[in-house]
């Protein structure tokens, strides 16, 4: 399992962070080997080899998630931390200039779904933002991640530093997701 971090240079390229590459040229998430061991059918998606289904099949898994809960590997999505250039300041006011969602008011470990905007206020992409102290954790869509990170880095030069993460990311979805989380990770369910 890989877990790496790198600074984004603002040119549209990430230096230092990488995903394992398969023989077919598609990237692999840190959970790739586990998916194979569990019998997943892998398909190309957003430049990655991703699991499309397991034994229940697409419809069975869909219904199970809608009725109960399903766990998804979303490690292909763009993940980054945003740090203030001045470690004694808060990065939220700087980042809030790029999104319509209230980031300054975000509570510790609070999450906000919002949109990344261009200089004219047009929407470039949607993203999730989580506050950790004076830093922010960002999750953006896989297909747009390099463009999103370039826009953020270029817009915040001298104000913030973007550090791209390459690690596993899971999404637990469905009406029983909270109960499943409480059963297996009680502290995380709060």
Predicted regions and their residues:
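Basic, glycine/lysine-rich polyanion-binding surfaces/domains
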Residues: 2-190
């Amino acid at each position: 399992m890989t877990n790496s971090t790198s600074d984004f240079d603002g040119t549209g390229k990430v230096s230092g962070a990488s995903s394992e590459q398969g023989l077919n040229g598609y990237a692999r998430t840190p959970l790739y080997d586990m998916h194979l061991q569990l019998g997943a059918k892998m398909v190309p998606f957003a430049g990655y080899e991703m699991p499309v289904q397991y034994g229940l099949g697409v419809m069975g898994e869909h219904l199970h998630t809608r009725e109960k809960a399903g766990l998804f590997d979303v490690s292909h999505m763009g993940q980054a931390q945003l740090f203030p250039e001045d470690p004694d300041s808060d990065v939220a006011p700087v980042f809030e200039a790029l999104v319509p969602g209230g980031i300054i008011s975000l509570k510790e470990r609070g999450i906000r779904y919002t949109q990344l905007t261009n200089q004219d206020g047009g929407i470039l992409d949607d993203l999730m933002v989580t506050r950790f102290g004076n830093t922010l954790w960002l999750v953006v869509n896989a297909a747009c991640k390099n463009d999103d990170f370039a826009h953020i880095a270029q817009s915040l030069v001298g104000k913030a530093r973007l550090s791209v993460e390459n690690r596993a990311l899971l999404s637990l979805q469905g009406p029983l997701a909270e109960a499943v989380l409480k059963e297996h990770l009680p502290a995380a369910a709060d």
